[in-house]
From Swiss-Prot:
Belongs to the SSM1 family. InterPro entries: HAD-like_sf, HAD-SF_hydro_IA, HAD_sf, Pyr-5-nucltdase, SSM1_domain. It comes from Saccharomyces cerevisiae (strain ATCC 204508 / S288c) (Baker's yeast). This is Suppressor of disruption of TFIIS. One of its GO terms (molecular function) is nucleotidase activity. It comes from the Eukaryota. It holds the Pfam family Hydrolase. One of its GO terms (biological process) is nucleotide catabolic process. Could be an enzyme that inactivates 6-azauracil by modifying it.
Length: 280
């Protein structure tokens, strides 16, 4: 069902978003706690990254993985996404919900469907949706997480800790800085919303190939991978990653997919030292 939104409605929407983004930026710039500054290069030149056959890489998803799904950030994100669907596609709340779920289930990310079928500007979508989330009201420095990642880095068993997310880089970096772990990773593979001609995301194999090239990984059997999506974990297993860990905090999300055979299941990322004890 088509719903008409007035120019006043859209102006109110834009103003609310702009005000929240300004607050988000001001807060981010004020951070001084350990791990609040990014120390790895972003958008590094792939051609300058040699593929090392002996390199061991641990790939980390971010959302609902480095922080708990019980923070309800996903719910906030869904509200923001649905508002975008309603205002920009002129849909009823019910139709927006159905279409969003359809794209998320089919492509792993709503924006991919929006770009493919509605010619949506992906960067504007990111600004109105992810950039406008008041993450600072929810995410705080996570000392236990930081200490665990430090142990993993210092063990000498893994060469690189690498972020692998379907979010755009803005959202990824905000999460890391707020959690106080932005200085513990070696790089970031994200869904590049500026490249709508080649927009790829997990669970697509091409997204994994991108992460492989950017990290310098030469062989999937030298890769460790943790994600809250069963579909993403399934791709990792099919590609031959050494260890794939499905993080299921409470129960499996049907849209994200069931736990595939061969995956390790944990309910909290702090369980990593118990399930891959040889790395710590």
């Amino acid at each position: 069902m088509t719903v008409e939104y007035t120019a006043s409605d859209l102006a109110t929407y834009q103003n609310e978003v702009n005000e929240q983004i300004a607050k988000n930026k001001a807060h981010l710039e004020s951070l001084t706690h350990p791990g609040s500054k990014v120390t790895f290069p972003i958008d590094q030149d792939i051609s300058a990254t040699p593929q090392n056959p002996n390199l061991k890489v641990f790939f980390f998803d971010i959302d609902n993985c480095l922080y708990k799904s019980s923070t309800r950030i996903h719910d906030l994100m869904q509200q923001s996404i649905l508002r975008f669907f309603q205002t920009h596609l002129k849909l009823s709340p019910e139709d927006a919900h159905v279409l969003n779920n359809s794209y998320y289930k089919e492509y792993g990310l709503a924006i991919r469907g929006l770009v493919m079928f509605h010619k949506v500007n992906a960067l504007e979508y990111n600004r109105l949706v992810d950039d406008s989330l008041p993450l600072q009201d929810i995410l705080k420095p996570d000392i236990p997480l930081r200490n665990m990642l430090l142990r993993l880095r210092q063990s000498g068993k893994i060469d690189k800790l690498w972020l692998f997310t379907n979010a755009y880089k803005n959202h990824a970096i905000r999460c890391l800085r707020l959690l106080g772990i932005a200085d513990l990773f070696d790089g970031l593979t994200y869904c590049d919303y500026s490249r709508t001609d080649t927009l790829v995301c997990k669970p697509h194999v091409k997204a994994f190939e991108k992460a492989m090239k950017e990290s310098g990984l030469a062989r999937y059997e030298n890769a460790y991978f943790i994600d809250d999506s069963g579909k993403n974990i399934e791709t990792g297993i099919k590609l031959g990653m050494k260890t794939c860990i499905h993080l299921v905090e409470n129960e499996v999300n049907e849209i994200l997919g069931q736990t595939p055979e061969g995956a390790i299941v944990i309910s909290d990322i702090l369980e990593l030292p118990h399930v891959v004890s040889d790395l710590f």
